[in-house]
Amino acid sequence: MEQKIVNIGDIQVANDKPFTLFAGMNVLESRDLAMQICEHYVKVTDKLGIPYVFKASFDKANRSSVHSYRGPGLEEGMKIFQELKDTFGVKIITDVHTEAQAQPVADVVDVIQLPAFLARQTDLVEAMAKTGAVINVKKPQFMSPGQVGNIVEKFAECGNDKIILCERGSCHGYDNLVVDMLGFGVMKNASKGSPIIFDVTHSLQMRDPSGAASGGRREQTVELAKAGLATGIAGLFIEAHPNPDQARCDGPSALPLDKLEPFLAQMKSLDDLIKSFENIDIK
């Protein structure tokens, strides 16, 4: 099956191309921290030769508690993103939660993300599709891999075929997520070769049934990322923080920022190896 290529500026995202890193921080905590984290990612990815897109949320609209930090909001968030682009020349990905956010966000960033909990909301899909932007679709935790084809088709019917699909784990009983490694191939087939990326960070979440925030298993970041890359995918989605225990959202799943370079060096070596193999077509 031919693998589709989605272009983000000069970056080619495809399952048979060198992996692209979609990474940054969970939520914009401050302008200064965003600048610090983005600068570190840019330095490391430039050194290793890894195509890179910076990720952060300007509004975490789906926090478990109404008291949890959500972010700086649309206006301030777009100002920070624009400064990051102007300073580092970096591409940006962020999520939208309402139809009204789609165009203002697409005017600034390079990829707009459809959140997992909202992936079947047709009005939101239509609004995002109309922007003409590259779209990253988070596969819902409650959806089987084969069903992503319906979301891709919905975007296509709305006039946008620049779709990336993102695996972020599936519900396994209550308060736990697992990643079915067979699902990557199913998603490729169901979407007719769309690029698949792997959100390692959020796949490591584990909820406290009585708590207002997610726990996590960041100590297993490396093994999970290696397993995903070994299936031959287009990219990784990672969140890092200089002090994960002090992060304002999803710290327990975040990669310590000082581990980024050794982590990515291993991921690049593995990805290069996997994609050097001749494809074996088994029917």
Swiss-Prot record:
GO terms for biological process: keto-3-deoxy-D-manno-octulosonic acid biosynthetic process. Keywords: Cytoplasm, Lipopolysaccharide biosynthesis, Transferase. It is found in: Cytoplasm. It catalyses: D-arabinose 5-phosphate + phosphoenolpyruvate + H2O = 3-deoxy-alpha-D-manno-2-octulosonate-8-phosphate + phosphate. Its EC number is 2.5.1.55. InterPro entries: Aldolase_TIM (IPR013785), DAHP1/KDSA (IPR006218), KDO8P_synthase (IPR006269). One of its GO terms (molecular function) is 3-deoxy-8-phosphooctulonate synthase activity. Coiled coil: none annotated. Pfam families: DAHP_synth_1 (PF00793). Pathway: Carbohydrate biosynthesis; 3-deoxy-D-manno-octulosonate biosynthesis; 3-deoxy-D-manno-octulosonate from D-ribulose 5-phosphate: step 2/3; Bacterial outer membrane biogenesis; lipopolysaccharide biosynthesis. GO terms for cellular component: cytoplasm. Belongs to the KdsA family. This is 2-dehydro-3-deoxyphosphooctonate aldolase. It comes from Vibrio parahaemolyticus serotype O3:K6 (strain RIMD 2210633). The gene is kdsA.
